[in-house]
Design a protein with these regions (language model features):
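Short loop/turn motifs at secondary-structure boundaries
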Residues: 1-94
Length: 94
């Protein structure tokens, strides 16, 4: 079975409304519809969480769970799918 550890994806995006890189694209999840994605700020607080991330509608656009824009900077993620977990960072720059 395919593993996320075999795939690279961009760690940054620019949700500024210009139509380019406005959301965090995670291509591997196109193959694993059942997944969980959690975004954590530098203080360890979960700021965004979802099930079934799909890169189309259900995707991280640099906003928290209330729809407020997050500050530019580095955030951490936990990606869970297919009984695997990947952790890393993602950078927001508007």
């Amino acid at each position: 079975m395919t593993s996320a550890f075999e795939f690279d994806f961009y760690n940054g995006f620019s949700p500024n409304g210009d139509g380019k890189n406005d959301y965090w694209n995670i291509p591997i999840l196109d193959y694993f519809a059942e997944n969980n994605v959690t975004i954590i700020n530098r203080w360890g607080n979960e700021v965004w969480i979802t099930e079934n991330y799909d890169n189309l509608i259900n995707r991280f656009e640099g906003k928290n769970v209330n729809g407020d824009e997050l500050s530019d900077g580095t955030y951490f993620y936990i990606l869970e799918y297919n009984n695997e977990e990947k952790r890393g960072w993602v950078f927001i720059k508007r």
